[in-house]
Amino acid sequence: MRFDEAYSGKVFIKSHPSFEESKVVIYGMPMDWTVSYRPGSRFGPARIREVSIGLEEYSPYLDRELEEVKYFDAGDIPLPFGNAQRSLDMIEEYVSKLLDADKFPLGLGGEHLVSWPIFKAMAKKYPDLAIIHMDAHTDLRESYEGEPLSHSTPIRKVCDLIGPENVYSFGIRSGMKEEFEWAKEVGMNLYKFDVLEPLKEVLPKLAGRPVYVTIDIDVLDPAHAPGTGTLEAGGITSKELLDSIVAIANSNINVVGADLVEVAPVYDHSDQTPVAASKFVREMLLGWVK
């Protein structure tokens, strides 16, 4: 990678040219094969990179600059269009290689099903893994119209994998009644509507544990993030999400990886959704990578 590519919009701003020297690897997962409403999130990773050139490199939230963190933007995984299972297998294989290389994986989606193979790779490396999940939707279905590979299923899958007591969902305001009932019955940690305040209560309980954080951009109210596939009114503000990212940064949990998914820029001609997403990525880089 040439030096000037760090400001080209082809990679996330200020990306380091060396994979070997970088602690973090940013990678895209341009998949939206299973969405139930509006497609387009496969274009999210590229647009987040493009608009990142408008970011300041300094975070007043964390008093750090991007210069202080070495991260490499690997581009997008070349997923086979329309083949969900093969795409998921490729994501799991790639993330497993990053973990073997002792990298911090930071994924850009893409629909939320892309998180499922990441969860599997993470659980293999970290037996005591916990999940922090911020989203408008429960994502607790076993299947959608008979199809188990759906963006409405990844949190149910990870509950079955690591135990529902190790999964913490915040900002939830949409889902089937049966999903909410199931979460309550099995002891999953599901917090409706809000993110920051319940998160502050949970973080001390997770001190010292390896935690993977997955953020669906639709946790935000559509006024703050119209560019997503399945809009849900009544969400949180971009400030609350920023404050939540900072709260995690200031906690004693061990964040071992993260993703930001469901940005669909085609529905947001002002670019406010990918612009917000790029800022969230900046704070994740500066706050979560130790």
UniProtKB/Swiss-Prot annotation:
Name the pathway it acts in.
Amine and polyamine biosynthesis; putrescine biosynthesis via agmatine pathway; putrescine from agmatine: step 1/1
Q: Does the keyword tRNA-binding apply?
A: no
CC cofactor: Mn(2+)
NCBIfam families cross-referenced by the UniProt entry: agmatinase
Which family is it part of? Belongs to the arginase family. Agmatinase subfamily.
- State the protein's purpose: Catalyzes the formation of putrescine from agmatine.
What name has this protein been given in UniProt? Answer: Agmatinase
